[in-house]
Amino acid sequence: MNAIVLEQHTRNRRGGPARAPHVEGVRHRFVRTARLRMHVAEAGRGEPVLLLHGWPQHWYAWRDVIPLLARHYRVICPDLRGFGWTEAPRTGYRTGELVDDLIALLDVLALERVFVVGHELGGRLGFHLSLREPARVHGHLALNALHPYGSARRLAPQAWRQWWTVFVETPLLGRTVLRRLPAFTRLLFRLGNPNPDTRAASAVEQFIATLREPDRARAAERVQTQFAYRELVPTLLGKYRPTRLKVPTLMLNGTKDFALSPAGLGGYEPYADDLRVELVTDAGHFLPEERPRLVAETAHRFFSRLIERQSASQVPLTEATR
């Protein structure tokens, strides 16, 4: 199956602004998989690194990280189903289905194994990709993400932090709020980033612009609805605990993350072969935008260690890197 390469400014058949925001050195194309048509932003050469954005963003969330990582790696930033310039069908928004999209993308790009950096929703997908296809993920840097081993007992005390999800996970209400009340989305970004100096209002407006489209507002709602109504309780009751996490994983979280307290991240090392947690002082929920240099440096340090470990074992890191 071949990738379909289109011009950066071509309008997505399912919507999306006609013009993608510009980042120096970034190439854009649309890739047709067996599941849907995905927009992918790419830069650099070397070992492939898959950057998975959070909710309710798209590839542009990585705008300051991409140039830094592209010095050492081939950086691949897809828009997830329903976000940015990727198609936004009515169905397919469960975590497992979003992971299916990523596997299909890796297949089309002929990538046998990748590094993954996932933020928030993207971090959750990175965990589930690692659990399902450990041979395809060499290492995972999870930013501001809830791992699949969370327990109700440990997370219940911080349930109040999720007050905002009621407005976006409720069917019909969520899409209406996201589409017609941009002030709510702006509020989430302000709460998520405690440092005014690193807030980029123009970037927030890029994300809001796509949410004004009915299909994408519906998609953003359904991601939240599927997780809240179908996946959260089974996860907290231990659905994934019998499955050991074999992929080396580093979790990076801000100490001032309004949505996810560091207190709920530790204590799950027994479920994994190599799982560590690091905290970023005074940082919030949007690490790729608040601390892009730190994210890139942490990723490079982590991935370099894994490459050295692989080289020492004299086993090829990947069979297909383009």
Q: Predicted regions span which residues?
A:
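A short, glycine- and basic residue-enriched loop/turn
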Residues: H58-W59, R124, A283-G284
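Flexible "cap/lid" subdomain of the alpha/beta-hydrolase fold that forms the substrate-access gate
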Residues: N2-R29, R35-V40, P48, I76, ...
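Generic recognition of short, well-ordered alpha-helical segments
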Residues: Y60, D64, A263, E290-L294
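Catalytic active-site module of serine/aspartate enzymes centered on a nucleophile-bearing elbow/loop
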Residues: D273-R322
